[in-house]
Amino acid sequence: MYLHYTLLHQTNLKHILIKLLKSYMLALSVIVIVKDAEIDIQRCLESVKWADEIIILDSGSQDNTLEICRQYTQNIFSTDWPGFGVQKNRALDKAQGKWVLSIDADEYLSDRLIEEIQWIISKSENRYDAYAIKRISFFCGKKIRYGDWYNDKVVRLFRRLPYISFTPAIIHENLNGYLHLGELKQAIFHNTMKTISQVLLKLEQYSS
């Protein structure tokens, strides 16, 4: 009985140490929430495939989204849809990296932004615990040059700390809790609605 307890204790301790070591070694976790995103998700994941960990949280995709995601990660989880803020926090809870990058399925990183993020997370000393990123949006294939989406900035890169999380908003969630905010020079691309039919579908989803 004592031997069995000792072996069980050693096994549990080993698993804990492995998990801690893995967490220590991971520099960056990427979190993505998805649903029926087969049109955009491959370009998104292709731009972050260099990350140490990719976490996918799906809320009931009926298209080929999950098949595409499996080409990039096995960390795929299915859940209900409580809204953007809660869903992103669920994905954040599963991340193990020192840094976290939250990216939407219809976004992707520029090559220069990839280099800048890699430089940021490799620094041994850094006073910032979160970074705002310029976002360049496209509507029906055209770059948006006016309105709220022009000169848009989103806080998406941040340290994985217990006091940093997303607001529990259904839409238009924000990151909260960071103390020192930096700003990256390079941009993330946002390929928003590509056709008028997508615009009408989005309006219907938000009004229902």
Language model feature labels by segment:
Residues 40-42, 63-72, 112-113:
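Acidic helix N-cap motif at the loop->helix transition within catalytic regions
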Residues 38-39, 47, 58-67, 104:
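A conserved acidic beta->alpha catalytic loop
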Residues 86-92, 99, 103, 110-208:
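Catalytic-site signature of metal-activated, phosphate-bearing donor transferases
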Residues 44, 51-60, 77, 105:
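Short beta-strand/loop segment that forms part of the nucleotide-sugar
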Residues 66-96:
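Conserved donor nucleotide-binding strand/loop of the catalytic core
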Residues 16-46:
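N-proximal low-complexity "stem/linker" segments adjacent to membrane-targeting elements
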Residues 3-5, 10-13, 17:
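Short hydrophobic targeting helices and cationic amphipathic motifs
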